[in-house]
């Protein structure tokens, strides 16, 4: 089953963002490599696996400044700290 994007700007043929295309390639490769293995809760697993490097790289980009990192991510600093603690990154 193919999923057709419902957002008008995507369906009219505008180019995909490089990040979106890269994520799509990785997800396709992951699904292909499953080779029939059962996976449950793929959505949450993918979000979890993407969130950790996202937090680490943004924090590195902001030279450890959590306020700047939170602003760049568009989340409150307390939320960032909670996530860092949750993943054992602090």
Curated annotation (Swiss-Prot):
Key words of the record: DNA-binding
InterPro entries: Fis_DNA-bd, Homeodomain-like_sf, HTH_Fis, Trans_regulatory_Fis
DNA-binding region(s) from the entry: 66-85
GO biological process: regulation of DNA-templated transcription
Gene3D superfamilies according to UniProt: Homeodomain-like (1.10.10.60)
Keyword set includes tRNA-binding: no
Keyword DNA-binding: yes
GO molecular function: sequence-specific DNA binding
Pfam family, one: HTH_8
Domain of life: Bacteria
UniProt family annotation: Belongs to the transcriptional regulatory Fis family.
Protein name as annotated: Putative Fis-like DNA-binding protein
